[in-house]
Amino acid sequence: MAGAPRGGGGGGGGAGEPGGAERAAGTSRRRGLRACDEEFACPELEALFRGYTLRLEQAATLKALAVLSLLAGALALAELLGAPGPAPGLAKGSHPVHCVLFLALLVVTNVRSLQVPQLQQVGQLALLFSLTFALLCCPFALGGPARGSAGAAGGPATAEQGVWQLLLVTFVSYALLPVRSLLAIGFGLVVAASHLLVTATLVPAKRPRLWRTLGANALLFVGVNMYGVFVRILTERSQRKAFLQARSCIEDRLRLEDENEKQERLLMSLLPRNVAMEMKEDFLKPPERIFHKIYIQRHDNVSILFADIVGFTGLASQCTAQELVKLLNELFGKFDELATENHCRRIKILGDCYYCVSGLTQPKTDHAHCCVEMGLDMIDTITSVAEATEVDLNMRVGLHTGRVLCGVLGLRKWQYDVWSNDVTLANVMEAAGLPGKVHITKTTLACLNGDYEVEPGYGHERNSFLKTHNIETFFIVPSHRRKIFPGLILSDIKPAKRMKFKTVCYLLVQLMHCRKMFKAEIPFSNVMTCEDDDKRRALRTASEKLRNRSSFSTNVVYTTPGTRVNRYISRLLEARQTELEMADLNFFTLKYKHVEREQKYHQLQDEYFTSAVVLTLILAALFGLVYLLIFPQSVVVLLLLVFCICFLVACVLYLHITRVQCFPGCLTIQIRTVLCIFIVVLIYSVAQGCVVGCLPWAWSSKPNSSLVVLSSGGQRTALPTLPCESTHHALLCCLVGTLPLAIFFRVSSLPKMILLSGLTTSYILVLELSGYTRTGGGAVSGRSYEPIVAILLFSCALALHARQVDIRLRLDYLWAAQAEEEREDMEKVKLDNRRILFNLLPAHVAQHFLMSNPRNMDLYYQSYSQVGVMFASIPNFNDFYIELDGNNMGVECLRLLNEIIADFDELMEKDFYKDIEKIKTIGSTYMAAVGLAPTSGTKAKKSISSHLSTLADFAIEMFDVLDEINYQSYNDFVLRVGINVGPVVAGVIGARRPQYDIWGNTVNVASRMDSTGVQGRIQVTEEVHRLLRRCPYHFVCRGKVSVKGKGEMLTYFLEGRTDGNGSQIRSLGLDRKMCPFGRAGLQGRRPPVCPMPGVSVRAGLPPHSPGQYLPSAAAGKEA
């Protein structure tokens, strides 16, 4: 269709973005001129819509030209056969010419490569030829008035001559031709006015009779034009609505696709692709299994680097929260860049400890060289910073080459990690190293092939673990200062005297923020930012772009459509083939081959059904006026007309009430179909009643007659006369009475075509049985079979239109439904990715980044005044961990650790522990915190006791969980817990692989509470005891304990919970008996047997012993 709503889609689907005030005002001024010829204000969007409707418009044009060709051909054939008729007019001999013209346009239109401009030109030519055809059908009498005898060459021109041809052409131009709405309306008005004017001036007749006939003709023209305008406007509005709905779904789909790409990139930045995709699939569709799935891979030839910033603790303690996060992000952001340059993968950041692996995701033969280069670059970076600020900062680096197991453990807050004895040794190498030196083992040295100068490292003199295992170490000797980072003008920033920590910290932050030196990215900024401006514009929310989905307003201007969305739709339209889409429909019934889709299609509400009934009521009123003007009065017809009008009024009232009351399902497809059929039959019965009253039923057997016609043998034959002079108008009313079928859009074409067949058959039977064709139609028309040709052509046009509308609506729905399904799929993917994202970051942190503007994104950090921090370690897990061929070099040991951590994670799924946030796992150490949800300071102070109580209960229940695992797995693991409370800083650092963490003295002390604690006990600080002493817990004072960096600290053991009377109801201790509680998650893992005696912890283990490389030292790095 051509004309279209301006900036919206009728009744729904949304319009677009409102323009400025000036453009809106201009649109309002033009509204009066363009109300019936609506289109999108955006030319690009309008062109898309034209392309969207091209094939359907081409099919409609073919149908229109076929009907017009049949019409002109039938009239030409009648002329060729020399059928008697009225006096010769201007149309004499023009019908064959018009038939040829319409057929020529039909051939041109059938060209597959026809484009929108060519189709519009074909439609305009067809309309022009239709206009000349209609004008020539007007009653222009060239032969003068009749000589009083029907036997003359022709009778006088009549007022009814050419009316049915004009009615048919007018309807076809509205319903099927691809011309603008204003052009179609103008055509209809010109045709009607021309016929009325010619009739009034050229047709000889008695004035009273002529004016009544002109009035009846005018009413019929009004009815056809009214129906045509309704069909044209609402058909196009519904199509534009479907187009905008599909576009909205595609827009949402693209927006969701971009969001999913961001989330996918985030996921890929945190985990290797192969691990991430496998975990994602299992996370969304958890397989049924007894054990939790472990995501561990083995790599036999890699190099591991551990690095620690020496002197960072004192500097960080003087920083504000924002400065600390900036410090960490700038430093580790630079380290991430260096890691990428040197083909290393950063694994984790632990306080100020940074470790990475080379040769992990992509095997490399020079992985040892890469790690050495990485270590030297890190030292150069810190050296540059130290020289610029005169702060005593340095880097201690340790390397080892060997085997690792990499992957993730647990069910929540996944973090990629590596485990093995070789990882532990690399960590020990860092601890035993010296500032400014790269400390390597003999194994790594052998992989360097003599490419670096080395010197003895004497690591065994500084570390007992190296001495015990007789490990020889070396230092890399750099030949010269390898990298001087530009952007540091030392003379401008070196102070004359030593600066205070606060000044140094501020200067360091500003210095590292210099883009020339450190191009550290904001975490998530590379993930959350789109690639180009067009893409960003296309990602605006649908509520901003499509504001009027429930109403079709012509004054809404679509000013700034998403260019990217339009380009995507354009590509879809290029690939779209209507024939391929028709494959989803049954060719004869046009039903969807998928039953479910057919059912959903029938559930759509017909928003124009009430309007169609109102229009039918108006048509009934027009029939009443025509009846009163020219038909003889009949009680039966009058009663039928009154009943028809009353029934239609009742239908309108019923539909209005149900719409106001919002009765669900009150107008199903079955009810709509039955009402449509009954209404059409009823309105048609009124016209058929007029026909019956005007036909010669009572005189068909009488010999007396005043009418003389020529028989086929050339003899004059006397035939009976008709009982009224308005037979032709009765037949015209029958033709117009079938038009209501065209305005019930949501009624399927099959029942319409069946009904049309019945009405046409009854029409022909009435004419044949009445003797009308044998009388030759009396004085009305000399062409006895012309009414039959008229009803057949009308029925053909209505059937083709019904099928075209049905195809159009079904294909529109199919395209919109497919777009909606894709959008829903992407929405599901988005929700799934968001679930995974919330499993990687705390919910409030993830939401912060999802809602942030990528252009203005800043570092995320948050200061908390009171947070409970817990470290829970299994110190004797290192005795269990062993690397043998029989356990796949330690994989089976990690499988059991995964079960333990997963069961701890499952505890957090309880609603009681919803405030606890898992931070990470460090080897066999589990770190969690409570009170990190953003709250006001007052609320935080009031709730800290309850928060700590929740954390304490969680720690107590962790002992129960570990006891059950011990019972089921023949082990005797022992838990050791430390809890502290105080201020912390939370934030996200690391641009390439963002990581959420918490820092502060509170975290360090909580780690020391674990490392200095006693196995099987929960050690807490004095502050925790003070906050929980009024709660139902039993505490035992341990006394003062020496804590690194803090001196002597008074600590307490939390022994368990007590009831209201002080009786201990839940205790902790090494001597307690382990009792199976029968948790469902652990049943069936192992047959219940008596646990083995506890394994004692070996004395003299280093801070990072085999199997758990970071429970105490690295975990307790001061932030």
Swiss-Prot record:
* This protein's UniProt keywords: ATP-binding, Biological rhythms, Calmodulin-binding, cAMP biosynthesis, Cell membrane, Cytoplasm, Deafness, Glycoprotein, Lyase, Magnesium, Manganese, Membrane, Metal-binding, Non-syndromic deafness, Nucleotide-binding, Phosphoprotein, Repeat, Transmembrane, Transmembrane helix
The reaction(s) annotated as catalysed by this protein in its Swiss-Prot or TrEMBL entry are: ATP = 3',5'-cyclic AMP + diphosphate
Q: Where are glycans found on this sequence? A: N704
The subcellular location is: Membrane; Cell membrane; Cytoplasm; Membrane raft
User: What sections of the protein cross the membrane?
Assistant: 64-84, 88-108, 125-145, 158-178, 183-203, 214-234, 611-631, 635-655, 674-694, 725-745, 753-773, 775-794
- Superkingdom: Eukaryota
Q: How is the cofactor bound?
A: Binds 2 magnesium ions per subunit. Is also active with manganese (in vitro).
InterPro entries found in the cross-reference section: A/G_cyclase (IPR001054), A/G_cyclase_CS (IPR018297), AC_N (IPR032628), Adcy (IPR030672), Nucleotide_cyclase (IPR029787)
Entry's Pfam families? AC_N, Guanylate_cyc
> Known Gene3D superfamilies for this protein?
Nucleotide cyclase
Give the molecular function GO annotations: adenylate cyclase activity; ATP binding; calcium- and calmodulin-responsive adenylate cyclase activity; calmodulin binding; metal ion binding
The residues listed in the UniProt record as binding ATP, with positions renumbered to this chain, are 308-313, 350-352, 396, 920, 997-999, 1004-1008, 1044
Q: Which terms in the GO cellular component ontology are assigned?
A: cytoplasm; extracellular exosome; glutamatergic synapse; hippocampal mossy fiber to CA3 synapse; membrane raft; plasma membrane; postsynaptic density membrane; presynapse
Q: Where does Mg(2+) 2 bind?
A: D308, I309, D352
Question: In what ranges is there compositional bias, type Gly residues?
Answer: 1-19
Subunit structure as annotated in this protein's UniProt entry: Interacts with CALM.
Written domain comment of the UniProt record: The protein contains two modules with six transmembrane helices each; both are required for catalytic activity. Isolated N-terminal or C-terminal guanylate cyclase domains have no catalytic activity, but when they are brought together, enzyme activity is restored. The active site is at the interface of the two domains. Both contribute substrate-binding residues, but the catalytic metal ions are bound exclusively via the N-terminal guanylate cyclase domain.
Q: What does this protein do?
A: Catalyzes the formation of the signaling molecule cAMP in response to G-protein signaling. Mediates responses to increased cellular Ca(2+)/calmodulin levels. May be involved in regulatory processes in the central nervous system. May play a role in memory and learning. Plays a role in the regulation of the circadian rhythm of daytime contrast sensitivity probably by modulating the rhythmic synthesis of cyclic AMP in the retina.
Report what the protein is called. Adenylate cyclase type 1
- Provenance organism: Homo sapiens
Gene for this protein? Answer: ADCY1
